Design a protein with these regions (language model features):
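Conserved Rossmann-fold NAD(P)-dependent oxidoreductase catalytic core, especially the SDR/UDP-sugar
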Residues: 72, 98-139
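Conserved active-site helix of classical SDR/Rossmann-fold NAD(P)-dependent CH-OH oxidoreductases
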Residues: 19, 97-98, 142, 146-153
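NAD(P)-dependent short-chain dehydrogenase/reductase
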Residues: 150-192
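Glycine-rich NAD(P)-binding loop of the Rossmann-fold in SDR/ketoreductase-type enzymes
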Residues: 55, 88-99, 135, 139, ...
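SDR active-site strand-loop-helix element
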Residues: 7, 31, 70-73, 112-117, ...
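N-terminal Rossmann/SDR dinucleotide-binding element
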Residues: 1-69
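NAD(P)H-binding glycine-rich loop region in Rossmannoid oxidoreductase-like domains
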Residues: 54-92
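Conserved catalytic-core motifs of eukaryotic protein kinase domains, centered on the activation segment
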Residues: 40-42, 80-87, 123-127, 175-176
Length: 192
C-alpha cells in the first residue's frame, strides 16, 4: 500500500483529495495547522492526522519517515490574504519550502508533488496557455510559486522525482469551503 504524506491536507483541495486517495486504498498522513478546525476529515483506518506547522523543521524531520510520496498543498492561497501579512505569506509560501524538500529528499520519499498555480504565467494574450510559455508572475503569491518551482527542479533526480502541477483557480464544494472564489460565492448565493 502506497503511503502518502500531504502537507496542507486539511485545506480546500486536501480535504477533497484525501477521501479520494483513501477510497483508492492509499495510506495517508495529513499534516496541517488545522486553523479551520480539526473535524474536516472523517476518521478512516488508513488516515493519520498530525497537527503541525510546516515551518517547524525539527517536527518534520521526526515525522517524515517511511512515506513513498509527498503532496505539497500548504500555502496562503489568495492574493488578498497574502497581502494582509506579507511576512507570514513569505514564511509559509517560500521560506519553509526548500527545508521541507531537503527533509523529504533525505528520507525514504521518492516522489514530491507540488501544487503551484497557473497564476505563474501572468496575463497572456494567447487563447491557450501551455507550460512552454514564459512565466511572468504578477503578485507575491505567484512570484513565490515560481521560486518554489525553481527550488524543486534543482532536487529532481532518478531517486527523487519531482512533479509540479499548475492548476487554474480551483472551485467547487469542499469540506473546507472557500468563499473568496467568485464561482463559489455565486453558487452559495444561488443555493441558499
Amino acid at each position: 500500500m502506497k503511503n502518502i504524506f500531504i502537507v496542507g491536507g486539511a485545506g480546500y483541495v486536501g480535504s477533497v483529495l484525501i477521501p479520494k486517495l483513501l477510497q483508492r486504498n492509499y495510506k495517508v498522513t495529513c499534516f496541517d495547522l488545522m486553523i479551520y478546525g480539526e473535524n474536516l476529515l472523517k476518521k478512516h483506518e488508513n488516515l493519520k492526522i498530525i497537527k503541525g506547522d510546516m515551518r517547524d523543521q525539527n517536527l518534520l524531520k521526526n515525522i517524515i519517515k517511511d512515506f513513498d510520496s509527498v503532496i505539497h498543498l500548504a500555502c496562503i492561497s489568495n492574493d488578498p490574504s497574502f497581502e494582509l501579512n506579507p511576512d507570514l505569506g513569505k514564511s509559509i509560501n517560500f521560506d519553509a519550502f526548500e527545508p521541507l524538500v531537503k527533509i523529504c529528499e533525505n528520507s525514504s520519499i521518492n516522489q514530491f508533488i507540488y501544487a503551484s498555480s497557473s497564476s505563474v504565467y501572468g496575463i497572456k494574450n494567447e487563447q491557450n496557455v501551455n507550460e512552454k510559455m514564459s512565466l511572468e508572475p504578477l503578485t507575491d503569491y505567484s512570484k513565490f510559486k515560481v521560486k518554489c518551482e525553481e527550488v524543486l527542479q534543482k532536487y529532481n533526480s532518478k531517486n527523487f522525482t519531482t512533479t509540479i502541477i499548475r492548476p487554474a483557480t480551483v472551485c467547487g464544494y469542499s469540506p473546507r469551503q472557500r468563499l473568496d472564489v467568485v464561482v463559489n460565492i455565486l453558487t452559495n448565493l444561488a443555493y441558499h
